[in-house]
Amino acid sequence: MGILFDGIQKLPSSDVGISRDLLLQWMAQCQMLEKVNMRLNDAAIQVSEWFRKKGFRTCILKGQGNALLYSTGLHRTPGDIDIWVEGGDKRVISFVRSISPHEKACYHQIEFPSYKGVEVEVHYRPSFLLCFWHNRRLQKYYERVKEEQFSHRVKLGEQGVITIPTVEFNLIFQLTHIYAHLMNEGIGLRQLLDYYFVLLHADIKDVVELQRNLKHIGLWKFAGAIMYIMHEVFGIPASRLIVPPNEKYGKFVLNEVLEAGNFGKHDKRNRLGKSQLGHNLQRVYRDMRLVKYFPAEALCEPIYRTWHFFWRLKNKK
């Protein structure tokens, strides 16, 4: 909403076409967004500093780092704080549970006590893929480039300094994040808008290497789908695209975005109930819908879900 309001402000008053009362309402909501983002900025700085004093290097993923790419970052709709903590799953899980013993862990992250009302998720892996061999390659990529990410410090407005990933890293990482939303519940507009700004700010020195990585990790077709959406819907110039747009895949993914929304909140196809059985059946139904376009991820999803059940049992407090 905040970004839409920024666009409306650039229009001549005669072209706005909405009432003054609604404009004032949006203005008030934008002011509220600014306050929330300022609070999240402060939380990101303080949580990062807290981990640093405990001996961990960190990197803020998505969120407040992405907001720096926007022309008016304080108007970006914020979420929680995702912080990548160096050290591997066993060390990080052990440390977090020494602070808060009952936090739940999954393959890539563990819950963490909220900081001044702000939700915090601690990542020991930035993201993952459901396909085991593609995920293995993705984790090797993260390990290979992590040094640059943990040392990429930027100023967060006037509030302080944080460490965030490079734009080059985000071209792959945030693509996997959007992919995970597609495979699990649904892609939201915020994820796509974030990626739009990542593309706008990307200064790709070696596009051949980037494309090689996308193919190696199994993201090539999905990247083509997102490039189609970026070009056709968001209007990004063709010169900014990282792979050739794929119209067939792009239209399919765009339809999923429009049908489901973020986390599938608006998906009328979800009719199997909210019970554990209904949720699992819904996942199978989703896999069947996706398998034609993204077979490796869709076919591995039930296997991954079973494997992850035992992983969580093993890593349960």
Residue ranges and their predicted role:
Residues 1-79, 84-317:
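Conserved NTP-donor binding/palm subdomain of two-metal-ion nucleotidyltransferases/polymerases, i.e.
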